[in-house]
Amino acid sequence: MVARSRKRRAAPQDIYPTCKIAGNCPADIQNKFENKTIADKILQYGSLGVFFGGLGISSAGGSGGRLGYTPLSGGGGRVIAAAPVRPPITTESVGPLDIVPEVADPGGPTLVSLHELPAETPYVSSTNVTGDGAAEPLPAGHGGSQISDVTSGTSGTVSRTHINNPVFEAPMTGDQDVSDVHVFAHSESSITINQTENTGGELIEMVPLRHPPRSEGDFRETSFSTSTPIPDRSALRSINVASRRYQQVQVENPAFLNRPRELVQFENTFDNPAFVDDEQLSLLFEQDLDTVVATPDPAFQDVVRLSRPSFTQSRAGRVRVSRLGRTLTMQTRSGKAFGPAKHFYYELSSIAEGPEPDILIPESEQETSFTDATSKDTQQEAEVYADGSTLETDTSADENLTLVFSDRGRGQGSHVPIPGKSTIGGPVNIGDSKYYTLNPGETTSFEADVISPVFIFEGNADGTYYLEEPLRKKRRKSIFLLADGSVAVYAE
């Protein structure tokens, strides 16, 4: 026997409208739509003894019933709702009504009597009669007074008004003169306009602004190297470009310094002299990852942004021009593109220190001032010669010379005569003065190998003079302190 397959019936909401008309609805479907199930009957019979409608259960608004919700921990008490406070009404002081003054006397007569006022006579201060002197005849009239208007022949008062409008200024071109307009108004309602040419004033010619002249060596040192310095530090200085985050790329093409755009993309354009592209700013490039585009320099492949240049110094001491580059090499399904960051740099030639200039200074003796013995008032500077320039010259310029020592503190001076060639090597006489003197008049013959003693003359703080310095040896010195403050040293 073959088992019959059970067919699935339609949904209850599709069966009930049809079977209700035919009257053959299944019991379960009819009880469900007509609320006659066992659960519905329990609620219907139970609701007869218990009422839960005021608690807001089921589909009610949840207002908490007629008394509302109360705290669980609070004691039973009545909640008093605060009523709004009515604003006070401002009261004004009320007084008696104002008494209106009476215009007419109630007890007076009804008719008002009229009073005649005297005629007003015009007052004339002075009379000026003009004309030929004939009086005009008056018209004949009947009784009563006749009043005639008398007009004086005096001239009216003239007023002058000069109006300047500070808001409006007339345009001036070239050497045009400004004129003043004067308006004269008379009492006879006549206006006279007088225009006066104003030829005075000073005409200042406009000249271009000139800077004061400067000398060739007048330069002002500043702490910045550009006309508009930027106080912010460079972005590359705050970022460690030597880290592993950036790929180091050294550029050999010198166009990287002033024309970096030519290294990223080909440009079939001509140079426009009216447009100057600022290569000192950040540069942006458009790259499509779907298409592969060749670049002039393979190192700049897929570059979409180049930062502004920054000048740094490498560890080797060379000047380096750096730019940070952003590349896009990969793209996700969501459209997010990313790529490695690169550090492009171009190293300039190192600046070596220049050689120091060789300055040849001829060796010469110390300059000494000499004064001729015949003239003590005139002082002449001696010329400086090299050591070998006077070896073969026979001159007698050093005959009868005097070495002058001056005391600046006391204003005194002493003269020490220096013997000539004929007396060199002779004895030295020590006189009563404070300096050792050499008398050229006294001569004595001696052997050629005999060396004369060496005397050292020391005065004040002006300096020390050594006689026959090449022959001086280390010997014991005797120091003499004189009464005037000078020091004499004798070497044995």
From Swiss-Prot:
Organism for this UniProt entry: Cottontail rabbit papillomavirus (strain Kansas)
Described function: Minor protein of the capsid that localizes along the inner surface of the virion, within the central cavities beneath the L1 pentamers. Plays a role in capsid stabilization through interaction with the major capsid protein L1. Once the virion enters the host cell, L2 escorts the genomic DNA into the nucleus by promoting escape from the endosomal compartments and traffic through the host Golgi network.
Subunit structure: Interacts with major capsid protein L1. Interacts with E2; this interaction inhibits E2 transcriptional activity but not the DNA replication function E2. Interacts with host GADD45GIP1. Interacts with host HSPA8; this interaction is required for L2 nuclear translocation. Interacts with host importins KPNB2 and KPNB3. Forms a complex with importin alpha2-beta1 heterodimers via interaction with the importin alpha2 adapter. Interacts with host DYNLT1; this interaction is essential for virus intracellular transport during entry.
Gene behind this protein: L2
Disulfide bonds: 19-25
Family: Belongs to the papillomaviridae L2 protein family.
Name by which UniProt lists this protein: Minor capsid protein L2
Top-level taxonomic group: Viruses
GO cellular component: host cell; host cell endosome; host cell Golgi apparatus; host cell nucleus; viral capsid
